[in-house]
Amino acid sequence: MCDMLDNKLGNRLRVDFSNISKQIEIPNLLQLQKKSFDYFLNLDNGESGIEKVFKSIFPIHDPQNRLSLEYVSSEIGKPKYTIRECMERGLTYSVNLKMKIRLTLHEKDEKTGEKVGVKDIKEQEIYIREIPLMTDRVSFIINGVERVVVNQLHRSPGVIFKEEESSTVANKLVYTAQIIPDRGSWLYFEYDAKDVLYVRINKRRKVPVTMLFRALGYKKQDIIKLFYPIQTIHVKKDKFLTEFNPNDFMDRIEYDIKDEKGKIVHQAGKRLTKKKAEQLIKDGLKWIEYPVEILLNRYLANPIIDKESGEVLFDSLTLLDESKLAKIKEQKSFDIANDLANGVDAAIINSFAQDGETLKLLKQSENIDDENDLAAIRIYKVMRPGEPVVKDAAKAFVNDLFFNPERYDLTKVGRMKMNHKLGLEVPEYVTVLTNEDIIKTAKYLIKVKNGKGHIDDRDHLGNRRIRSIGELLANELHLGLAKMQKAIRDKFTSLNADLDKVMPYDLINPKMITTTIIEFFTGGQLSQFMDQTNPLSEVTHKRRLSALGEGGLVKERAGFEVRDVHATHYGRICPVETPEGQNIGLINTLSTYAKVNELGFVEAPYRKVVNGKVTNEVVYLTATQEEGLFIAPASTKVDAKGNIVEEFVEARQDGETILARREEVQLIDLCSGMVVGVAASLIPFLEHDDANRALMGSNMQRQAVPLLTASAPIVGTGMEQIIARDAWEAVKAKRGGVVEKVDNKSIFILGEDDKGPFIDHYTMEKNLRTNQNTNYIQHPIVKKGDIVKAGQIIADGPSMDQGELAIGKNALIAFMPWNGYNYEDAIVVSERIIREDTFTSVHIYEKEIEARELKDGIEEITKDIPNVKEEDVAHLDESGIAKIGTHIKPGMILVGKVSPKGEVKPTPEERLLRAIFGEKAGHVVNKSLYATASLEGVVVDVKIFTKKGYEKDDRAIKSYDKEKMALEKEHHDRLLMMDREEMLRVCALLSKASLNSDQKIGDKNYKKGQTADISELEKINRFTLTTLIKAYSKEIQKEYDDLKNHFQNEKKKLKAEHDEKLEILEKDDILPSGVIKLVKVYIATKRKLKVGDKMAGRHGNKGIVSTIVPEVDMPYLPNGKSVDIALNPLGVPSRMNIGQILESHLGLVGLRLGDQIQEIFDRKQKDFLKELRAKILEICSIPRLANEKEFIKSLSDEELLNYARDWSKGVKFSTPVFEGVNIEEFSKLFKMAKIDMDGKTELYDGRTGEKIAERVHVGCMYMLKLHHLVDEKVHARSTGPYSLVTQQPVGGKALFGGQRFGEMEVWALEAYGAAHTLREMLTIKSDDVEGRFSAYKALTKGENVPATGIPETFFVLTNELKSLALDVEIFDKDEDNE
């Protein structure tokens, strides 16, 4: 399909090679974070996350029942500063949270201590300051720095069953169950080598599971009945009889079934059918004989008590033998735990055997008989060893562990998972454990061990969920409130007298909440410095999923399984995009179409299939909902009516690929590209690349630096405009309308809605610094008179071209060696690329300096600096700050600053100087801000902040006046446009109505009943208009008044907006304590492509520029055009990224077809528009879904010319991932573009002019310049700073350090016998302090370097030994000989 890319989003046509027409639009890429934070702040009027957290902590009661604190309501304030102000002034973009708290004073019954009534109620509003607010671009401004909170992928609360190999016994599997809460104690169930079932709480010492059941209040008999079927045995005439139950004989029968009289009614070894069993019951079979040999290994379910004496003969769980059976015969009946008859596990019986001994010992030490109390005490001792305990405290402790909502929270998700897994029907709102949960978990684990249950996969996306910003913030708020709750309870206990005077504010300290939240944003692992290199890096950063962070995994201990791609990732998590290195697989990205539901589970979209027919109904399913369903891939052949063509389809079911009948298929993938994430879906022909290289390609696109002029790729995938649509860099129209005025800095759009006309104003941001020091600049892409729709991109941001992402440049490349310069992935570049600034980028650096108030006086920003030459400060203005436009070189002063020197008695020379030059010269010292060693560029902006109460300097006043003038001009322009529009509408209204009296309008006279010409009406002014309107009917006068009132209201709104902006401008600067002035200087640096810069394609094909060759020396084509870049052909086969070859083929086709369109322009014949239309139609008819002819025919001549001009530089293609151009389409394109079918061409050597022996693959590839720039990495040191302790040179470019001469380098010098060089390296070039000083002296005087001394390292060692109380003496060699 020839996709116009929805003309509202960009002005570009692309030939689209999709196989499948898109059913739904790609959802907003940032909706997960937006929705999550909106829920937290309650922006859609439901119960907010904040409300829920407050309600979970409040009310707080006084232990003595005197007071209670209740939460009433909360209200969110408005931000005090704008986003731009916060970034410039280093503030946090935040709001105040106002919460209403009610303090109730109770009347107490003196005898019972119970509450009997309310004495007093007080309500108070308490402010919680600085709750960071999400910006409209889904980031946070913390202390002036833009940050992103990454989504966390963590283990879902609920129950999970696992099977692992035993660490102690070979070839034995160990089964475990875990109940995982969101907050509270984890509960582990596990078998040991002897098949005893144990339980652990929070990985403490294990106790038999029956101990926990007893602590929960269950008696021994209750536990037996819960886990084992009980069989009653009747004793009759020395025979053991039991009731006949056919269900006991479902499998083959081990013994003969005999009736009461001993007659065999069914023989052993034969199967008892249902029919036969019914017949036996009909025949009156009620009792059957229970064989003694079977009875011998059974356990008693209930104790057997002697009827006469009342003493217990045998306790429950006694193992029966012949002697015991003989004694039991005297009883009429007894119960046995029919444990092993149905293959039921003996684990619980074994656990009873284990806990019996422990309870006996506890009985003696604690003097308590109740086994339930003893079990609670045992659990308390395991959890808190060494602490004294009483039974009530132990019971309360066990209850608090799992049943107290303050301490334990499963969450709605955990409850849903528990109910689903264990078949429970506990209501959703019960988020603590129940006894039934614990019993059912133990039962299910026994089933799992016996091969009947289902083992869980912890990496299944049904067992992992996403915590987004809203939930993470709610958790932090809960932590802060929990600390505050503890503090309030402590205050309650210390309150004795004057309870009537206590106010909520006396009890609540809101700082505890603020500090917890700010700590999370500044130091949390999930709050990260936003990657702003280009729009793609920003969007993918906000879509990132991290398994690390608080409550997540630790990267050092994360195994291979958790990092691996899981079958459930399909359509939910991108299998390609993840970092290389130790975080591989732990940090992922959401797939393009994936959504996250309310419970935090990732959903993938599918279309429903009914009886082999694909419907248009799209459903989003989680990994759990998808289980067991047959899902066909998007590439399944479907006819025009949507019926699946082939009878058997390759489908997926639970991660396995199987062959299914078309009638069995229930779902089909929405599209082929749903598997991968945003970055991977930007790689054309991704299906032809090896996954490892695609991973590098995805990651390197995020590192592409925005270039001076952006150009969209010739070979795109259609995702470019989606990223531009959702990235905040582009300016999008809030409301539709007509472009009234456009210049480099602003766009004015005049529109009309239900209320009437309006003017929207958009300001273009210029030369702003991003987090990665790249240049943020916007430029309009609309013209005056253009009609725009709401949401349309009206201005491109950095790395954007006509509303599409453009992170690199289209370059003509040849795969050929060039004199060894492209050995090992190196890149040979033509000088033309540098001359035309193709890969030039602008970077902005911020340098700041502050003037402080010191005890000796105040520091001053000034041009008057002591001991500095006049020419060194010539570029500074009168205020001592570099002028805008100044070319900065390393070592130049950016801002002059002098600091007062402490008073010292002056020397005679100083006294003389003071007498000559005045008082000041001696008192101050130069503390100016200098340009660092690698900083070179132009000053583009200066920001000056002055503390309230201190005088602003001239530069700050001029800067303020300039900004004020810009605001005034913008306001004036908007008012003018409003006035013009008002007059136009009034004239249009009056020109349609007839006059009620004779009037002279302009130069013409009109009689009553005539209508005035609009041209004459436009000549009159406003004052004449007020009298003229009276000559019209009352209806017209009313319409005129309505129109006038509407425009007056709009002007009032504009005035209010303008006043608000002025107020912001005039606000006092907030600076840290002690700082009186802060100056920020912004320097823009132009970085041209250099040898050493890193470049890459989109397929993981990266390399370093090795040489820049004059254009005339580069290989050239038969038409004389030289190639831009020469790449090594050996970089392709072993890397298996063939996508780059296909991309360069299609890119060349685009260039050649573009040349053909340019030829039509150049010929400019009479019917050239007709020819253009025919050519574009011919190109667009090649893709499979060629249904664009109507669209191209419907284009006006002007629209067609716009698209054709764009295509003349290269026809743009869109080849979505997994739906790329096929062989037939390629051959058609090659013929149309007049390219040889092998895609190769003859090339000539630029230096000799000779034809190159072999035909060479030449194509057009989209190349990126990455932010690993040589200018920022190259570094050299002669002398510089030394480390204080070791006296060795410091390391790193930032500290102006030296190169490390390590162990292996020492070996190299040793191997060559370079003894003197080695000695120099280890002494005077390193840490021989005296040696380096004397060497420097000798070198300056031209003498020989003297002998080296003792390195400082030796003294450090001796001092270390001295600190261990070892005396170290150093003897000279000569002294020793004596």
UniProtKB/Swiss-Prot annotation:
Q: What is the lineage of its organism?
A: Bacteria, Pseudomonadati, Campylobacterota, Epsilonproteobacteria, Campylobacterales
The superkingdom listed in its UniProt entry is Bacteria
Q: Which SUPFAM superfamilies match?
A: beta and beta-prime subunits of DNA dependent RNA-polymerase (SSF64484)
HAMAP family the UniProt entry points to: RNApol_bact_RpoB
How does this polypeptide assemble, per the annotation?
Answer: The RNAP catalytic core consists of 2 alpha, 1 beta, 1 beta' and 1 omega subunit. When a sigma factor is associated with the core the holoenzyme is formed, which can initiate transcription.
Q: Which PROSITE patterns match?
A: RNA_POL_BETA
- According to UniProt, the name of this protein is DNA-directed RNA polymerase subunit beta
Task: Provide the reaction this enzyme catalyses.
Answer: RNA(n) + a ribonucleoside 5'-triphosphate = RNA(n+1) + diphosphate
Does the keyword Ubl conjugation belong to this entry? Answer: no
Q: Identify the keywords attached in UniProt to this record, alphabetized.
A: DNA-directed RNA polymerase, Nucleotidyltransferase, Transcription, Transferase
**What InterPro entries does UniProt report for this protein, alphabetically?**
DNA-dir_RNA_pol_bsu_ext_1_sf, DNA-dir_RNA_pol_bsu_external_1, DNA-dir_RNA_pol_su2, DNA-dir_RNAP_su2_dom, DNA-dir_RNAP_su2_hyb_sf, RNA_pol_bsu_bac, RNA_pol_bsu_CS, RNA_pol_bsu_protrusion
Q: What class of enzyme is it?
A: transferase
Q: Name one GO cellular component term.
A: DNA-directed RNA polymerase complex
- Give the family per the record: Belongs to the RNA polymerase beta chain family.
Example GO biological process term? DNA-templated transcription
